[in-house]
Amino acid sequence: MRSAAKPWNPAIRAGGHGPDRVRPLPAASSGMKSSKSSTSLAFESRLSRLKRASSEDTLNKPGSTAASGVVRLKKTATAGAISELTESRLRSGTGAFTTTKRTGIPAPREFSVTVSRERSVPRGPSNPRKSVSSPTSSNTPTPTKHLRTPSTKPKQENEGGEKAALESQVRELLAEAKAKDSEINRLRSELKKYKEKRTLNAEGTDALGPNVDGTSVSPGDTEPMIRALEEKNKNFQKELSDLEEENRVLKEKLIYLEHSPNSEGAASHTGDSSCPTSITQESSFGSPTGNQMSSDIDEYKKNIHGNALRTSGSSSSDVTKASLSPDASDFEHITAETPSRPLSSTSNPFKSSKCSTAGSSPNSVSELSLASLTEKIQKMEENHHSTAEELQATLQELSDQQQMVQELTAENEKLVDEKTILETSFHQHRERAEQLSQENEKLMNLLQERVKNEEPTTQEGKIIELEQKCTGILEQGRFEREKLLNIQQQLTCSLRKVEEENQGALEMIKRLKEENEKLNEFLELERHNNNMMAKTLEECRVTLEGLKMENGSLKSHLQGEKQKATEASAVEQTAESCEVQEMLKVARAEKDLLELSCNELRQELLKANGEIKHVSSLLAKVEKDYSYLKEICDHQAEQLSRTSLKLQEKASESDAEIKDMKETIFELEDQVEQHRAVKLHNNQLISELESSVIKLEEQKSDLERQLKTLTKQMKEETEEWRRFQADLQTAVVVANDIKCEAQQELRTVKRKLLEEEEKNARLQKELGDVQGHGRVVTSRAAPPPVDEEPESSEVDAAGRWPGVCVSRTSPTPPESATTVKSLIKSFDLGRPGGAGQNISVHKTPRSPLSGIPVRTAPAAAVSPMQRHSTYSSVRPASRGVTQRLDLPDLPLSDILKGRTETLKPDPHLRKSPSLESLSRPPSLGFGDTRLLSASTRAWKPQSKLSVERKDPLAALAREYGGSKRNALLKWCQKKTQGYANIDITNFSSSWSDGLAFCALLHTYLPAHIPYQELNSQEKKRNLLLAFEAAESVGIKPSLELSEMLYTDRPDWQSVMQYVAQIYKYFET
């Protein structure tokens, strides 16, 4: 991808940026108003040269023009869809959401018009796709100058139309789904009404018998209704097929949007160069990497139709609420000019960069701007992933809704079939009734003919006997009926009498109790009055006695006064006669008064005595009445107690009978419930088995597909291995020829050497005879110049065979010859052990093949995914060869395990987007984890309707609004509010460090998780704590620890499923 970034360097150098020009980019409006500088003219000339080069490439390659046009169309559609969706979300968030509601749902033809317009755009020479999009479409501060070309405005208009069309298409699909739901409910209600009418008509015909056939509903009346229903069903199926087609097109577009090669190109460009601007489409197509990308796009488009439904996944959701509203999505966090695909979270674009800002020094960008850029890029990446995740969730919910619609249509078809079955059975019963009526008429005719043929006397006798028997039976039946009716009436009368007597006795008891209470009160009152009278009588007696005593004392006093008066009269008759007479008169008057008062008191005493006698007589009468009434009450109370005991016994018996009946009713209800439960269980087992069979078939098809790909890969690798074997065979043959020639030359050299030695010995003998001891020493130093010939021959041999190192030592040992022979034999026989021997031959220093420049094993016998790992790891090449060659002998699980082991990312490798996409395990779709999860999920019921009814996430979605994914996300945010280092925005990267799991479980299980001691760097500890805490309360771990540890973005569907398990356990 560096070659794609190089054409931009001269244009950037022409600007001459320095460290003092690092500033945020100006707005788009100011860029339009500003005049073109010399740098922009140079940039446009460079761009025109690139356009001409790319047009020549496309003309030279006619097969790739259609593919590139389709790719450009796809890129415009998908990039336009993302930016338009984000712009509409931002506009609706600021208050213009009512305008989108007011406009309504556009017709589907608007989308076709925009697509045709977009398709016609790339044909012209001024293609808006060839404009520079990165400097003008990013609001992030970049070190490059704000450049603008005149063709950006029509491009933005085209993209805006495409985006608006996509959004309106989604809204139209949602509205049509709602309309179809209402139509399905209406059809169901009509079917129910029709069924009720038919059952009522069938009951009427059964009750009236065969004589009332004329009153039943004729099949001619039901035929127009059936036809109307069939026409509605056909129209409904047509509309469903149209909706499915539109849904499929949208799915393809959205999936292509998620995996768009434009985003991959932008990510790789930002990964290789430190400039965080995206590469234009034309530069990617003009460079060799662009052509490579176009071929990859074609392969992806071929495979996308098979994998569209598999990538979307399956999650039960409420599609009517999974709308793209601003509060239920993450589009509001993204600006309209973000790049289409950011970098991965693990690859920092400034850590592995090998070029600084083009045309400037490496210190031109400050650390603050770098940090802000990395933060913004990471934010944009998070927002992009969350939007992709939400789009996948909406796709899944749309597919679920579509499946529900299909199930409803299937139910409708079943109801239609049942209706036809009922109609056929009705017609059969009607025909059967007609046949029976005809047979009855025949039998009646036969009976009449037989009666006519018989004699009249016997006929009359039989008739009389039959009449007598019939009258006897009728009288007996009437008598028994009357008897039973009489018994029933007697029982009812006796029961009523007993009830009336019981009620009368109860009323009598109440009255007697009330009278008794009244008499007791009267008696108490009389006693109280009697006591009062007795007290007044006693007081009167006391006063009377006092008066008597006073009277006696007065009498005695009077007598004394009389005596004194007589004495005084006798003594003082003369002097005081007048005074005495006056005193006597006063005393007499007092005496008269006292006598009058005494008479009054006596009369009062007589009256009190009379009243006392009257009160005593009344008291006696009241006591007699009380004793009489008491006896009557006791007698009646005894009678009532007896009757109440009898009634209580009867009531207890009736209660016992009622209890027995209730127990029997409960037992029967339990049996009915048990039968229903058994039936439901059997139905569930049947549905589960059907779903498991369907899933097993899907797994079988997936495995067959993967097996085909593996066999294809095996064939390619075997062909490559054969080619390598052929090359190696030729190299071995050449080496053997060289070896044979070298051995022959060695033999000739040895013969010459022996001959020279013999000559030397003879000469030495002659010299020894002639000369002395000193000459012998000089003759012994003579062989080296003689040995120059073998050396020269060896040099000649080396010159004739360049690249071959001939050993100066003794001939090669027999081991090397045997290894070469065994290697050739293994090639001839096709043994897989030759690869290891080949590598051992290259490693041995004494082998004659060590100098031959033969292609090494990793380049030929290792798969392309292993080549990436062989550059940095020290893994031996024989391991990959033996693994791949021994595949047929291993079971499938071992093959998959070995494949996932070989595809693990190397930690020493620098992470680039291409390597990361290659080494990411979920991209395979063929690992042990996926097989295990598929096997665990293979026994779940397939019906989306039953899942929708039992799913607690539907209630959560109704509570929070929006889709199930967004509702669960909001619930997690609400539960983890207040926890440090927790920011949940999606179901992939927000959960990778395990802190979100720990915080969520800490709200329910604080004793299991010490949250204050946790750290985001210790991923393994966090995940183990969370999984163990969840498993301790019964939540099964559905996530793989290895996948969570080695990937920064785990599968969001499995994470969402695990969080949904936590929600179901603690909240439902």
UniProtKB/Swiss-Prot annotation:
Q: Which CDD domains match?
A: CH_CYTSB
Q: Which family does it belong to?
A: Belongs to the cytospin-A family.
Q: Which residues carry this modification: Phosphoserine?
A: 38, 55, 112, 131, 134, 137-138, 218, 241, 361, 366, 369, 425, 847, 863, 912, 914
Task: Point to the regions of Low complexity compositional bias.
Answer: 29-40, 126-144, 912-922
PANTHER family reported in the protein's UniProt record: CALPONIN HOMOLOGY DOMAIN-CONTAINING PROTEIN DDB_G0272472-RELATED, CYTOSPIN-B
Where does the record place Basic and acidic residues bias? 154-200, 898-909
Localisation per UniProt entry: Nucleus
Q: Which residues form the Calponin-homology (CH) domain?
A: 962-1067
Protein's name in the database: Cytospin-B
Q: What disease involvement is noted? A: A chromosomal aberration involving CYTSB may be a cause of juvenile myelomonocytic leukemia. Translocation t(5;17)(q33;p11.2) with PDGFRB.
